[in-house]
From Swiss-Prot:
UniProt region (Disordered), positions on chain: 1-25
Record carries keyword Lyase: yes
Family: Belongs to the class-V pyridoxal-phosphate-dependent aminotransferase family.
Catalytic activity from the UniProt record: L-cysteine + H2O = hydrogen sulfide + pyruvate + NH4(+) + H(+)
Name the record gives this protein: L-cysteine desulfhydrase
Biological role: Catalyzes the production of hydrogen sulfide (H2S) from cysteine. Is mainly responsible for the degradation of cysteine to generate H2S, a regulator of stomatal movement and closure.
Annotated gene: LCD
E.C. code: 4.4.1.28
GO biological process: L-cysteine catabolic process to pyruvate
Organism the protein comes from: Arabidopsis thaliana
UniProt tissue specificity: Highly expressed in stems and cauline leaves, and at lower levels in roots, rosette leaves and flowers.
Length: 454
């Protein structure tokens, strides 16, 4: 068997192009959208799309077809269908993100996998003596916890050090973030050290803020940072992604959050610069050493169907007015509108101005709820789920000495925020249910200290 015949996802072994789009049906009506998401649990205000995303019924049907195709004849699927299907998905994504070459795009399970790929490479450079002990990785303090754990597992234990930049929150401007980031880079270079990697969120998770990613990457280039990894778990489907404009070495975004794919799938962009062979998938298969796109395309027998439905997702989004751009714009505008409604009802604030929001918005909770810890935030979130059928994350804002914070209409310090999401299936009533639940808790003088145990 020729090597090229067995390399799943290898664009060099097939002159494959994404299939032409079939003639689509008309624009989706509100009833059509309800039908697409009829599998969602009824009676729940599901305003947390940011955590786990959603997948329409038509895409789930397409996924089931891929699964059955494998089960009918696994060998034929492995040697033909899988290879071609993965390349079709990668080609769609490559075009969407304006990559120079489809071979800059790999499909992995999630952003956590991509972070492991990057940080394992950095760790190897420390272990092999290419980097000096105490050279640094710079990131924001609110980086996703799995990224921090990967640094601990792969970098810190072999001599690398970490500088965490505190993200201002609530935040009022990009300039506040840029100023803090410059301070972090300066700290990372102290005592003759070299900043080997900067990790930048495109959209932070908790708290949620749209970051000035292009400006931050540009600063990294000006300041001599060796490599830049953008963790954009929430980006594709939320904001325009142009990897050439952004200019990072590595960029990852989940497609199961805001891009309607079933879990789990993310694209991982690795800029071509001659050293791609140093980057490997954490799961080693017989494709090791054949390039990351090929390594990622076969990590052993498993269900690859979520990575094969990207063309079907495009068919779905193109049935909305304006396509993906129209969806992103509406989600942003509705999330901001609902956020302002909640802030007005509770006498609080937004965590960032509308231009620094996406389809997710942070809204301050009334101080009378007395959220005083992460445990209180979890308790309140669980209470809202069980007693009000509202699914929304609660973020505890731990102020440090010297930080003044923001006060609500009762002159109390705002110590917690909810993060609402808006996706095409959401309705105004979902947010009104949250509004009324919080208002009722405050009226009944309920605090996190006297909420009954669940």
């Amino acid at each position: 068997m020729e090597a090229g015949e067995r390399r799943n996802g290898d664009s060099m072994s097939h002159n494959h192009r994404a299939p032409k789009k079939p003639r689509l049906a008309g624009l989706l009506t509100e009833s059509d959208i309800d039908s697409e998401f009829a599998h969602h649990q009824t009676g729940v205000a599901r305003i947390n799309n940011g955590s786990f995303g959603c997948c329409p019924g038509s895409v789930l049907e397409a996924q089931r077809e891929w699964q059955l195709r494998y089960l009918r004849q696994p060998d034929e699927f492995y040697f033909n269908g899988l290879r071609r299907g993965l390349l079709a998905s990668r080609t769609v994504i490559s075009d969407l993100i304006n990559a120079d070459d489809v071979d800059e795009v790999s499909l992995v399970d999630n952003a956590t996998t991509a972070a492991a790929i990057v940080l394992q490479k950095v760790g190897r450079c420390f272990s092999e003596g290419k980097y000096k002990k105490e050279d640094t990785v710079v990131m924001f303090h609110c980086a996703f916890q799995s990224v921090k754990k990967s640094i601990q597992a792969y970098v810190s234990r072999v001599g690398g050090s970490t500088v965490e930049v505190r993200l201002p929150f609530p935040v009022n401007s990009n300039e506040e973030i840029i100023s803090k980031f410059r301070e972090g880079l300066e700290k990372g270079r102290a005592n003759g050290r070299t900043v080997r990697l900067a990790i930048i969120d495109h959209i932070t998770s908790m708290p949620c803020v749209l970051m000035p990613v292009r400006e931050l990457v540009k600063i990294c280039r000006e300041e001599g940072v060796e490599q830049v990894f953008v963790d954009a778990a929430h980006a594709i489907g939320s904001v325009k992604v142009d990897v050439k404009e952004i200019g990072a070495d590595y960029y990852v975004s989940n497609l199961h959050k805001w891009f309607f794919c079933p879990p789990s799938i993310a694209f991982f962009y690795c800029k071509k610069r001659g050293s791609e062979s140093d980057v490997h998938h954490p799961v080693v298969s017989h494709e090791f050493g054949n390039g990351l796109p090929i390594e990622s395309a076969w990590i052993g027998t498993r269900d690859y169907s979520s990575q094969l439905v990207v063309p079907s997702v495009m068919e779905f989004v193109n049935r909305f007015e304006g396509g993906m751009e129209g969806i992103m714009m509406k989600n942003h505008d509705e999330a901001v509108r609902m956020g302002l409604m909640l802030a007005d009802a509770w006498g609080t604030n937004l965590g960032s101005p509308p231009e620094m929001c996406v389809g997710m918005v942070m809204i301050g909770l009334p101080s009378k709820l007395c959220v005083g810890s992460d445990e209180d935030a979890i308790k309140l979130r669980s209470y809202l789920r069980v007693h009000y059928s509202v699914e929304v994350p609660v973020f505890y804002l731990g102020l440090r000495d010297g930080e003044e914070g923001v006060k609500d209409k009762d002159s109390g310090l705002i110590t917690a925020y909810v993060r609402i999401s808006h996706q095409v299936y959401n309705k105004t009533e979902d947010y009104e249910r949250l509004r009324d639940a919080i208002t009722e808790l405050v009226k009944d003088q309920m605090t996190c200290q006297n909420l009954p145990a669940l």
